[in-house]
Amino acid sequence: MWIVLCAFLALPLFLVTYFELGLLRRKRMLNKFQGPSMLPLVGNAHQMGNTPTEILNRFFGWWHEYGKDNFRYWIGYYSNIMVTNPKYMEFILSSQTLISKSDVYDLTHPWLGLGLLTSTGSKWHKHRKMITPAFHFNILQDFHEVMNENSTKFIDQLKKVADGGNIFDFQEEAHYLTLDVICDTAMGVSINAMENRSSSVVQAFKDITYTIKMRAFSPWKRNKYLFHFAPEYPEYSKTLKTLQDFTNEIIAKRIEVRKSGLEVGIKADEFSRKKMAFLDTLLSSKVDGRPLTSQELYEEVSTFMFEGHDTTTSGVGFAVYLLSRHPDEQEKLFNEQCDVMGASGLGRDATFQEISTMKHLDLFIKEAQRLYPSVPFIGRFTEKDYVIDGDIVPKGTTLNLGLLMLGYNDRVFKDPHKFQPERFDREKPGPFEYVPFSAGPRNCIGQKFALLEIKTVVSKIIRNFEVLPALDELVSKDGYISTTLGLQPAEKKSRDAHNHKYDPILSASMTLKSENGLHLRMKQRLVCDST
């Protein structure tokens, strides 16, 4: 009995000793990096906070503490380096071998499988090469038609929710718009999310992204085996099956339509251009001389929908929120719409060419992405030792690239908390000092798609509405944003004490969101001020 009891009591000590000895080399190397002191077993997890917002604030606090440079931290026995140094960014993003994603992306595997976002090695290289033509200029023009159609429906929806000066959560509304756009462009089907919000498929998209975000910040729910015992697991399984069945059914129908068409002599390029979707491109593609399998089709379509939905919700949401707080910039954008489209042409859709000539709109979106990048962090995992800028980064380390921090670095951007779209005319940040869509061989393949959608939606909103803050008092009187991330700790604490309930509370997991929504008002425009 005593032997069993002693063994039971000694087990924790044995496990701690076992893990500590196994990490001696990695710890020794990483201790050369600045960072907070860690505890056995938990690392720095006890300092991180309990919510995505608290964790984000902790990261920025450490960033200030360690001179706005790289720092290391531990979550249990998982070693991490937060990368904010542009030299490190350049090495990592330019590397042809450092392309393995961090383990947080494993949370998407049950839904996305091993598509372009999560695959690595030869599969990633082959599929990247295969998918690149799907974002060719001509296909983007086709996608733009779909974006315009859904944006028109979105304007009608906004007229209803904004009626009578109503304060509403624009982030919530944008979620349904971008879901409609991505389903139309990815699979050539409309799920009418804006009108049918309670459908099982629409709700499933919302639920699964929330679950992934929740698991990312829960050590035990992050484990795929332990998550089976979580109270959320049964509902998650149901949600996952709903999405898998929906996507696979559409793929099967699309394959059948193509077979029927080809059997009677219809060529693939004779399908209506308007109906050509990302899925059609995949069905016409080959890898190693063969068509894609059903599983590969599922993985790439699901990945495209995931990456093209949540990120554009964030991009559109924060851009329109900034319109509400900065009326002077909104006026410049409205006048540009009049100049480009003509005083009598504001009611029609902007063409692909017109969108591309809206220079101030481009500057506005760049500045919005500097402050609120849709993807705040990118994770890479070192499968071998790397020497970066003279430092040895050991095998088994997660490199978290802090894209969000880059935008608030006053060494790169003067007066970073001031919203100044024209800064991108005056200041030319280095190629790895401003990377809202990543860079290098694993950059965002859908960057042009995302920017086109954001610009199309913002352009249409500006022409139809004057965007107002939730309350008049929330208009920025000096050009500064309400977000306090990146400020010196003392100034941040002082400013946070005066924050309004309608000021965004940022949270970051795989995409940037506002935990309390993006509340604003809209007033319909009647005429074009052609001055």
Swiss-Prot record:
Topological category with respect to the lipid bilayer: Peripheral membrane protein
Pfam families associated with the record: p450
Keywords (A to Z) from UniProt: Endoplasmic reticulum, Heme, Iron, Membrane, Metal-binding, Microsome, Monooxygenase, Oxidoreductase
Role: May be involved in the metabolism of insect hormones and in the breakdown of synthetic insecticides.
Primary subcellular site in the record, as a coarse category: endoplasmic reticulum
Cofactor: heme
Location in the cell: Endoplasmic reticulum membrane; Microsome membrane
Family from the record: Belongs to the cytochrome P450 family.
GO molecular function: heme binding; iron ion binding; monooxygenase activity; oxidoreductase activity, acting on paired donors, with incorporation or reduction of molecular oxygen
Binding residues annotated for heme, in chain numbering: 307, 444
EC annotation from Swiss-Prot or TrEMBL: 1.14.-.-
Gene Ontology terms: cellular component: endoplasmic reticulum membrane
This protein's name: Probable cytochrome P450 4e1
